[in-house]
Every structure is written in C-alpha cells, then in structure tokens.
From Swiss-Prot:
Belongs to the universal ribosomal protein uL29 family. The keyword Ribosomal protein applies. It comes from Thermococcus onnurineus (strain NA1). NCBIfam families: L29. The keyword Ribonucleoprotein applies. This is Large ribosomal subunit protein uL29. InterPro entries: Ribosomal_uL29 (IPR001854), Ribosomal_uL29_CS (IPR018254), Ribosomal_uL29_sf (IPR036049). GO terms for molecular function: structural constituent of ribosome. GO terms for cellular component: ribonucleoprotein complex; ribosome. The gene is rpl29. Keywords: Ribonucleoprotein, Ribosomal protein.
Length: 66
C-alpha cells in the first residue's frame, strides 16, 4: 500500500484497514506456529510495514487537525 493511497483515505477508513491487516497478520502467524511453511515468507513483513505506514499517516492527519 502506497503512502499516497493512504493519505487519500479518511481516519475511519485507515482504522478499518489497520484492523483488517492485524487480523490477517494474526492468521499468518497462526499458520507459522502450526509448523506450516508460508508460500511467501515476505507476507508477514509486508503486513507489518503496511500497518506502520497506516499508523504513521494516521498520526500525521491527527496532528493536522489540531
């Protein structure tokens, strides 16, 4: 997910996307703990980075509102 795409979203949409990604991350981690190998090991890393991007831009938007 690109930062420009995130900046176009509202804070509510960002919150919703964060919840979705955290659920997806939990599912991927559960697969790993069961001993299965992931098709793409970069998935977890990419999800974590997307969450970080979303949180960063959310904070930027909240600062602008003040």
């Amino acid at each position: 997910m690109k930062p420009s795409e995130i900046r176009e979203m509202s804070i509510e949409e960002i919150d919703k996307k964060i919840r979705e990604l955290r659920l997806e991350l939990a599912k991927e981690r559960a697969v790993l703990t069961m001993g299965a190998s992931l098709e793409n090991p970069m998935v977890i890393r990419n999800i974590r980075r997307d969450i970080a991007r979303l949180l960063t831009i959310k904070k930027e938007k909240l600062r602008e509102k003040r």
